[in-house]
């Protein structure tokens, strides 16, 4: 059988290694971008045929093509593959076809899915279980096939799920849904359907945990598994209390709104698995939040700085803003074809001053007539401007609302740059 790998990012690289280890000899790699010399040397050494700087019809000779999650479904090469009757799949589906599905936990949502997956992994590990954490976050799922685990905790994205034919997981968590990735998906409905797909492949013995506040959820009567909603009258988080099925538990700290939702969703599933809320809360005490997600950096001249570089959509920015009264907000990056009029209308009461740079300014500009704002050229200038327009006691929030790729390799590099600038200014001010 001839296997094609369309795109050679992290997931397909991991899949290639697994295929080679298991004796699959006829593999063809097709990458739209230029491959680095080390990668080409490795492929030649392994006897793998490849092409770079474009995807050609050579892929049509493959029996199955595993698509990197970032490949858009309406790209020319995908259209040709579909027209040619080539079976299209993805690395996540490859894993699910071979793993013990009773052990797989899938977590998705527009915001909070990485942190929730990490929290679920931490809570299970705290219980003494051997747990794999990966998927869209961190390690590709296929890596887990080399060992046996008690549980596989996977963050799954809409891109991955779109390409999956039958993504069944025994436990599935849907955190939230809002407009996102409309530069990739053809419509919000397609995005929503991708996010929901695992629920429709679950069996009656499985569990589906979901946010009751998602207004766009369709009728779930066709969903077979046990359905457990959160944000209900008896299952919610309020201030520093977790309430599960009417029973109240004190949280071990104060958390931003999105983190509260993450805690709520994970606690619901954990309680369903073990009936041990106290055990979950005990694990929460030692959980370290992921960087670049409402990360408090410290203070300079009495101003509080927050790094929320992971916020790549306006929905995520609104979530960050909800933690404060009025802030100095820094936005940048590439917009995702969202409704920016509605965003500004909802965000305006919480914005003292907006500082913006990058491509997203074009999206925001028509709606800024009643918002005090400044246009800058880069993050360094944005930081200086934020100090200039703020006063002691203000919050300076870096929550970009757009993808990073216009100026940075990824959101993490962008967040690291913001942190570096903060540390430099803090040192210059002589503050500890």
Curated annotation (Swiss-Prot):
Task: List localization entries.
Answer: Cytoplasm
The entry's keywords: ATP-binding, Cell cycle, Cell division, Cell shape, Cell wall biogenesis/degradation, Cytoplasm, Ligase, Nucleotide-binding, Peptidoglycan synthesis
**Catalysis: reaction(s):** UDP-N-acetyl-alpha-D-muramoyl-L-alanine + D-glutamate + ATP = UDP-N-acetyl-alpha-D-muramoyl-L-alanyl-D-glutamate + ADP + phosphate + H(+)
Q: In which pathway does it act?
A: Cell wall biogenesis; peptidoglycan biosynthesis
Q: Which domain of life is it from?
A: Bacteria
Concerning SUPFAM superfamilies, the annotation shows: MurCD N-terminal domain (SSF51984), MurD-like peptide ligases, catalytic domain (SSF53623), MurD-like peptide ligases, peptide-binding domain (SSF53244)
Family from the record: Belongs to the MurCDEF family.
Q: What is this protein called?
A: UDP-N-acetylmuramoylalanine--D-glutamate ligase
| Species | Thermotoga neapolitana (strain ATCC 49049 / DSM 4359 / NBRC 107923 / NS-E)
Q: What is the lineage of its organism?
A: Bacteria, Thermotogati, Thermotogota, Thermotogae, Thermotogales
């Amino acid at each position: 059988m001839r296997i094609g790998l369309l795109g050679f990012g992290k997931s397909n690289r991991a899949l290639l290694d697994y295929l080679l280890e298991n004796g699959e000899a006829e593999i063809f790699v097709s990458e739209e971008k230029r491959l680095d010399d080390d990668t080409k040397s490795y492929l030649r050494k392994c006897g793998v045929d490849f092409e770079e700087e474009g995807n050609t019809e050579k892929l049509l000779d493959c029996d199955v093509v595993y698509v990197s999650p970032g490949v858009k479904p309406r790209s020319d090469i995908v259209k040709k593959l579909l027209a040619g009757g080539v079976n299209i799949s993805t690395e996540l589906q490859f894993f699910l076809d071979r793993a013990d599905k009773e052990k797989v936990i899938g977590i998705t949502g527009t915001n909070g899915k990485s942190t929730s997956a990490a929290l679920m992994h931490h809570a299970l590990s705290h219980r003494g279980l051997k747990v794999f954490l990966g998927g869209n976050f961190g390690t590709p799922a296929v890596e887990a096939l080399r060992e046996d685990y008690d549980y596989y905790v996977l963050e799954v994205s809409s891109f991955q799920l779109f390409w999956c034919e039958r993504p069944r997981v025994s436990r599935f968590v849907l955190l939230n849904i809002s407009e996102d990735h409309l530069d990739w998906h053809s419509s919000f409905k397609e995005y929503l359907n991708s996010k929901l797909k695992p629920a429709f492949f679950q069996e009656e013995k499985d569990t589906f945990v979901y946010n009751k506040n998602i207004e766009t959820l369709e009728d779930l009567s066709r969903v077979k598994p046990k359905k457990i909603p959160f944000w209900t009258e008896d299952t919610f988080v309020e201030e520093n209390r977790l309430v599960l099925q009417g029973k109240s538990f004190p949280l071990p700290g104060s958390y931003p709104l999105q983190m509260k939702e993450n805690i709520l969703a994970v606690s619901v599933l954990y309680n369903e698995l073990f009936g041990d809320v106290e055990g979950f809360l005990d694990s929460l005490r030692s959980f370290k939040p992921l960087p670049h997600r409402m990360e408090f950096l410290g203070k300079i001249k009495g101003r509080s700085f927050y790094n929320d570089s992971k916020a790549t959509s306006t929905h995520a920015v609104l979530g960050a803003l909800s933690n404060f009264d009025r802030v100095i907000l820094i936005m940048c990056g590439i917009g995702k074809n969202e409704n920016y009029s509605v965003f500004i209308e909802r965000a305006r009461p919480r914005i003292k001053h907006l500082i913006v740079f990058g491509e997203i300014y074009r999206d925001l500009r028509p709606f800024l007539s009643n918002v005090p704002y400044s246009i800058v050229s880069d993050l360094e200038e944005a930081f200086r401007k934020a100090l200039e327009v703020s006063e002691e006691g203000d919050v300076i929030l870096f929550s970009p609302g757009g993808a990073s790729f216009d100026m940075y390799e990824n959101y993490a590099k962008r967040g690291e740059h913001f942190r570096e600038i903060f540390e430099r200014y803090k040192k210059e001010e002589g503050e500890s």
